[in-house]
Amino acid sequence: MKYLITFCMCIITFTAFGQIKNIDMKKEKPKNLTECIQMLDKNLKTEDKDYIKTLTEDEFFMESHFTIGMGIRNEWIRSGNPELVTFFLDQGVKHPDDMSAMILTSYYRHLLGKEIDFEGQISAHKKELEQ
């Protein structure tokens, strides 16, 4: 129960006071992970990128899930973008939340100059599904 309350408080805090603003994702529809990263890089403001760099990967994911992540799910995944959805389905990723999580994780790692390790993300996802 203590963890549930902590989790809920984090969600409320990040949603209410988060620094990363949603960006306009309606203009272009990426077809794969590389294009997603390029479009996020192009559309995020420099101050947002600088802020993201101050966060841990988990902090970025928690803060962006209901902002940028929601935009990714609504505009790139759910609103008629068969190429991107097919890209993830071919990897065994079926849920929009999981798709946006991999895009966000990959973007964060790209921004920090880390290895994206998409295959590792897919492998971890498959292990989670097996449990």
Report residues per predicted region.
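Bacterial Sec-dependent N-terminal signal peptides
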Residues: 1-22
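Compact alpha-helical subdomains of small soluble proteins
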Residues: 48-51, 55-131
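Short, functional N-terminal and low-complexity linear motifs
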Residues: 7, 36-40, 70-75
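N-terminal secretory signal peptides
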Residues: 20-62
